Amino acid sequence: NMPYQTIDSGLFYQKIIDKLKQNTNICFFKNINEVNTENSYIFNSVSNAADSKNNLWQHFSGVEIETIKNSFDDEIFNLMDFDCDQKNSVHFFYTLPYSKTKALIETTWISDLNSASLIDYDNQLKNYIENKLRIKNYKIIFKETGAIPLFHPKNIKKLNQVEIGTAGGMTRLSTGYTFSNIQEQSKYIRKNIENIKNTKIF
């Protein structure tokens, strides 16, 4: 069995960027309006899913909190606590302790994105922390919010463009997990980069 793990995205991205910057043939550009694809390839991670609010999404918001007193069992995490208001959807809370006084707590929904009451994340988290976990004194260190499409976005195939990540169908639709699949896809692309147009990606 593999232990459940969490990765600090900021540290992960910085490690990768620092590694890439060691290569003199790699350049970083921002705010590019036009890209010439005639003699190059584009690896695109931006999907067309944003306009599909009526489809099924896993959307969430989480806070990393720190408490004054010992409030968590740092050897046990609660992956899905369904003892909460479902509002005719699927709703659960997630608690991942880092120590006895620090934890990440998330509210997660599986639904469309049309209901304002479902995305009232701040009140959901406040009520859960104070009423369910019975923690009154805490401070928020970090906050995150996101939405993962539980459907494959229908991107229009373009010449010399490879869809990667969620845009490339790497999200596991049953769970929303994507990270491991992205690593495998990246390895495949790297292995076949010299002959990428003849691979099964196209």
Regions found by a protein language model. Give the residues of each.
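Dinucleotide-binding Rossmann-like beta1-alpha1 core, especially the glycine-rich loop
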Residues: 1-19
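Short histidine-centered catalytic/ligand-binding loop motif
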Residues: 2-5, 109-115, 175
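Predominantly flavin-linked oxidoreductase catalytic cores and closely associated redox partners
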Residues: 14-139, 149-157
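Aromatic-anchored, charged helix-turn/loop surface patch used as a conserved interaction hotspot
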Residues: 57, 173-177
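Short FAD-binding loop at a beta-strand-to-alpha-helix junction that anchors the flavin cofactor
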Residues: 95, 100-102, 158-174
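An active-site-proximal "capping" alpha-helix that borders the catalytic cofactor pocket
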Residues: 125-130, 178-196
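Active-site-proximal substrate-binding core of FAD-dependent oxidoreductases
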Residues: 140, 150-154, 187-202
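Catalytic cores of enzymes that engage adenine nucleotides and/or redox cofactors via long glycine-rich
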Residues: 141-148, 166
